[in-house]
Amino acid sequence: ATDGDADRIGVIDDKGNFLHPNDILVLLYYYLVKFKGWHGPVVRNIATTHMLDKVAEQFGEKCYEVPVGFKYVSAKMQETGAIIGGESSGGLTVHGHINGKDGIYAAALLIEMLAVTGKKLSQIMDDIHAECGEIHMEERDYKFTLEKKLKMQEVLMEQKQLPDLPEEIDHVSYLDGSKVYFKNGGWVIARFSGTEPLLRIFCEMPDAVEAADICTRYE
């Protein structure tokens, strides 16, 4: 199914589970490289799964990170020659197609992938995890008033405060929100939505329980 303007898709897999847009991106990048023989990097925004990094590394490619906003994805794709780029909110495009998001094209490419591989979506995801490893994402949204937003901005972006986190920190980026990169490969980002009065927390860790725990620490 697509959204109203058909620039994003929603997918239910063969087991009846909703396929997260992160997984759609991972599946299509894996398909383009492994089965279609394409070569090139991938582009994702700062809040999108690092499974793309793992798949890229597996095939000797690179993953580029950009701020949230599809214009940044498109620009980086043109700059680097990336073969696919997208965001965890559901938009993606492929090299040689349009520079904007296209849900119908993405759906057609998924169907092509199923036909070419002869496998179900869940089976291909299992193959990816077996080859590239697995990480778990937790997402939280928090509503706020304008007064609360100003206070949170001060704490996160000006004072650069962080909660007590259980993993050793590699570095912190303020490219778009406050993103902590852990030495174990995990990460967590706190950023304000550009379209809704929400503070969004995304965390991805090797362990699902720890990802949920880290999100809770931001409360």
Locations of the language-model features?
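Phosphate-binding and adjacent anionic-ligand microenvironments
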Residues: 38-219
